[in-house]
């Protein structure tokens, strides 16, 4: 077996050759697309060397240099490269002209040029362009592009501005130099909706969203969102759109959520097509967030791009943070922050604790596709949020202006970003930027003392779980101090902790107060603080920061579960007091809905692994006991609420707002597995015109023999809608008991509407089983592990990205009891041996196996 060769950050070498301009001419055919390319190269000063181009599975017909034909037998073809000897190259500038043949119809990887239901689509980030054309496929080589597309399709699109649009060909020119990963082409019999936007400088931009005709009427929300994002970026960051057109295409077969190709964004259709009756309220918000994210990339990613893929944290961290700021302005700011924090803890904290942990800016990788992670995206965004909190909004925007000014049109590094901010601030930021360079979630240990009339709180940094190396970080700790009556003894303050330990002190107090920590989750840390239950109750009742209230409720959940797990008394005292506090928050329905969300198995497992070896069976038993107690306390509240909800016909979209529906859905979910709401739910399921409520009812019906017809009815009514079909698939898998989940898995994967090569289908069934049905996956006999390993083996040869993503379901096996680890290890060992797995999947698999 050949030694694994990692790419290392320290090995970066600037390119000797540059691509000044790229001209591509496509003659589209599903099975035999011909591409003629002309690339103008220049060589930087230095000794001439061979020209090494990247390319995979490319059938080259001919190659010319400055018009002179070069025999293919004089070139060196590697598995992923084409080497042109230096003797054929010009002294400084020269043109390479090539023709190659592609077969989009057989491309199941969904990278490069492929077909999605008859539509030609490309995906080039990070290294897909090399599957289209031999080139310098690296992000620090920026070129202008001219693209001509021949074919008999209604619309043939590429980056930049249209030069010519005719019946049988189109031509596009992008005047802004870009790396190859931002190239895009789409062609097919699509229809479109359009709008216009006038920038602050007076430029008129045409906006079009292209989609298949079956989706007519579903692009209006997206068009509104694009215009809002454009205006927001102008007002908040001074960034105008720079092309004459902004096009988006929705396709059904797409590995990612969306892609920010310059002037031609490509979206997974589930994240952009929306209508009031068949989309949920969360779909509404998610569509807006993803549209904003991809649009904001126009500056943080496109105009300013990455020098190499180790800098991915910069473009994605900045863009995720900007997207988060935007969404806080569009929806309820505090609820948005709860959702961001919830996602971070459930995904990034879990990643940081396991064998796939890595720094936000990694120093090595085997397969770059594997580093599109929660750490690179969400943790990087949290680091940038902390920077803004510490230096203030005004200085942060000055730093961003400096960054855009210095790096526009460049492929830059994290260090460039750091230097631009240092220039504005006049201070060294090296210690703060350590956040990007070390893996793991820091622990913040808190202790408090009340002696005499003095209250002292001490903060101490500790190393993360499973990481021996740790440098003390600079972090903002936002806090409030309140008494048991809800009076705040001082306004919100932010302590910048820049050493291992520090303290704050309040004097001349008559009684011990309570401290409410990490308001708005000001730093991505794990807090270790044995705070009294009375203090937690005071924070839950009186704190005005929603995120702190939400985190406090979680702490009380864990305390109650600890008591259940160890058969301690007084669990109901906690639940009773929480109930009394929560029912008085009806004026904050969105917050109440978030507080009513029960802990899920994965969440509880992640919490337990910090201190013990969690047993899946015990987790299930304890959580069910806890949920049953909660249901009992909230039963009358739920019945009373739904009587009013039904009486006022608030199940109709026009009679309610999303806050009201959010609370209704939370109560339905809280009471799943019961039947005392059935009369209300049947009315909602059969007559509501809001999909959030219908899907919540569907969740409640899973596993109930008396509700099988309702589950079937949902499919018959909405099965032709691909987004709802996948919700129907996923709901049956996620909320089934283990035995039923296995049955459903086999039933749904043989369903006539299931296509394993469609990423949305695969994730909704296989991915949901592996990652969202904790107890079905973690079976003592190892059957869940074997089931998923078999699917990984099936999909890996066709789509390595999906296979690698699914393999990550095994990342926390190391924390389970030995009986589970042994079964998983045997399964993974069988999977890794003799299957010739892709680099994507092997990298993930090897790291997990090494941890067992």
Report residues per predicted region.
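N-terminal, polar/Ser/Thr-rich
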Residues: 1-34, 110-121, 130, 429-433
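Beta-strand-rich binding/interaction modules
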Residues: 59-66, 428-431, 439-517, 639
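Hydrophobic alpha-helical and helix-loop surface patches within well-folded domains
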Residues: 172, 209-458, 666
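Surface-exposed beta-strand/loop patches in extracellular or lumenal glycoproteins
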Residues: 40-59, 134-137, 143-152, 415, ...
């Amino acid at each position: 077996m050949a030694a694994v060769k990692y790419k290392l950050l320290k090995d970066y070498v600037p390119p000797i050759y540059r691509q000044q301009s790229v001209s591509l001419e496509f003659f589209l055919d599903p099975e035999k697309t011909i591409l003629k390319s002309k690339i103008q190269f220049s060589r930087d000063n230095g000794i001439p060397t061979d020209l090494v181009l990247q390319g995979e599975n490319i059938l080259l017909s001919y190659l010319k240099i400055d018009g002179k034909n070069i025999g293919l037998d004089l070139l060196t073809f590697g598995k992923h490269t084409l080497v042109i000897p230096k003797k054929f190259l010009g002294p400084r500038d020269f043109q390479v002209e090539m023709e190659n043949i592609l077969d989009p119809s057989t491309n199941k990887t969904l990278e490069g040029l492929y077909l999605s239901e008859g539509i030609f689509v490309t995906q080039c980030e990070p290294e897909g362009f090399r599957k289209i054309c031999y080139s310098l496929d690296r992000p620090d080589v920026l070129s202008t592009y001219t693209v001509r597309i021949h074919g008999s399709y209604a619309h043939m699109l590429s980056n930049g501005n249209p030069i010519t649009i005719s019946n049988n060909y189109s031509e596009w020119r992008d005047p802004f130099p870009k790396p190859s990963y931002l190239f895009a082409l789409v062609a097919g019999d699509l229809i479109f909706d359009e709008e216009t936007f006038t920038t602050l400088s007076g430029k008129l931009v045409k906006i079009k969203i292209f989609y298949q005709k079956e989706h007519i009427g579903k692009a209006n929300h997206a068009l509104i969102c694009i215009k809002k994002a454009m205006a927001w970026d102008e007002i908040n960051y001074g960034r105008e759109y720079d092309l004459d057109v902004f096009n988006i295409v929705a396709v059904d077969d797409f590995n990612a959520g969306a892609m920010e190709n310059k002037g031609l964004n490509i979206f997974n259709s589930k994240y952009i097509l929306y209508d009031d009756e068949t989309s949920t309220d969360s779909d509404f918000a998610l569509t807006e967030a993803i549209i904003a994210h991809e649009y904001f990339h126009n500056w943080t990613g496109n105009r300013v791009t990455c020098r190499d893929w180790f800098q991915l944290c910069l473009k994605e961290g900045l863009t995720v943070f900007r997207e988060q700021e935007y969404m806080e302005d569009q929806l309820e700011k505090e609820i948005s922050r709860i959702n961001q924090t919830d996602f971070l803890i459930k995904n990034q904290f879990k990643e940081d604790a396991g064998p796939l942990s890595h720094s936000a800016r990694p120093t090595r990788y085997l397969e770059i596709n594997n580093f599109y992670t929660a750490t690179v995206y969400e943790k990087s965004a949290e680091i940038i949020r902390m920077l803004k909190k510490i230096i203030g909004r005004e200085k942060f925007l000055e730093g961003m202006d400096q960054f855009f000014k210095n790096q526009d049109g460049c492929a830059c590094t994290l260090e460039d970003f750091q230097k631009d901010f240092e220039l504005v601030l006049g201070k060294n930021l090296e210690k703060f930027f350590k956040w990007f360079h070390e893996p793991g979630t820091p622990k913040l240990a808190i202790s408090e003392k009340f002696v005499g009339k003095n209250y002292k709180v001490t903060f101490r940094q500790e190393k993360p779980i499973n990481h021996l190396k740790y440098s003390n970080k600079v972090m903002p700790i936002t806090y409030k101090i309140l008494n048991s009556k809800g009076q705040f003894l001082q306004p919100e303050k932010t302590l910048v902790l820049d050493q291992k330990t520090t303290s704050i002190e309040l004097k001349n107090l008559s009684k011990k107060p309570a401290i409410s920590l990490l308001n708005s989750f000001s730093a991505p840390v794990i807090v270790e603080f044995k705070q009294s239950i009375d203090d937690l109750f005071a924070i839950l009742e009186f704190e005005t920061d929603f995120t702190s209230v939400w985190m406090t409720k979680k702490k009380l959940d864990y305390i109650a579960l600890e008591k259940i797990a160890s058969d301690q008394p007084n669990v109901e005292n906690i639940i009773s007091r929480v109930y009394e506090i929560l029912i008085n928050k009806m004026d904050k329905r969105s917050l109440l809905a978030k507080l009513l969300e029960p802990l899920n198995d994965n969440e509880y497992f992640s919490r337990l692994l910090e201190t013990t070896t969690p047993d899946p069976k015990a987790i299930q038993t304890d959580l069910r006991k806890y949920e049953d107690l909660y249901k009992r306390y909230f039963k009358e509240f739920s019945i009373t609420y739904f009587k009013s909800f039904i009486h006022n016909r608030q199940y109709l979209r026009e009679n309610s707002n999303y806050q009201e529906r959010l609370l209704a859905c939370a109560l339905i979910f809280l009471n799943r597995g019961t039947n005392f709401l059935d009369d209300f739910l049947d009315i909602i399921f059969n007559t509501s015109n809001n999909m959030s409520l219908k899907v919540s009812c569907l969740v409640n019906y899973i596993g109930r023999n008396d509700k099988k017809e309702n589950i079937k009815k949902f499919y018959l009514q909405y099965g032709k809608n691909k987004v709802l079909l996948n919700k129907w698939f996923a709901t049956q898998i996620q909320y089934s008991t283990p035995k039923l989940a296995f049955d459903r898995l086999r039933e749904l994967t043989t369903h006539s509407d299931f296509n394993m090569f469609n990423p949305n289908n695969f994730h909704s069934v296989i991915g949901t089983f592996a990652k969202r049905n904790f107890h079905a996956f973690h079976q003592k006999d190892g059957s869940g592990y074997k089931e998923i390993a078999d699917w990984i083996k099936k999909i890996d040869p066709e789509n390595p990205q999906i296979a690698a993503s699914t393999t990550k379901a095994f990342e926390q096996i190391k924390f389970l009891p030995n009986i589970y680890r042994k079964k998983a290890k045997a399964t993974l060992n069988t999977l890794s041996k003799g299957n010739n797995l892709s680099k994507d999947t092997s990298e993930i698999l090897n790291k997990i196996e090494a941890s067992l």
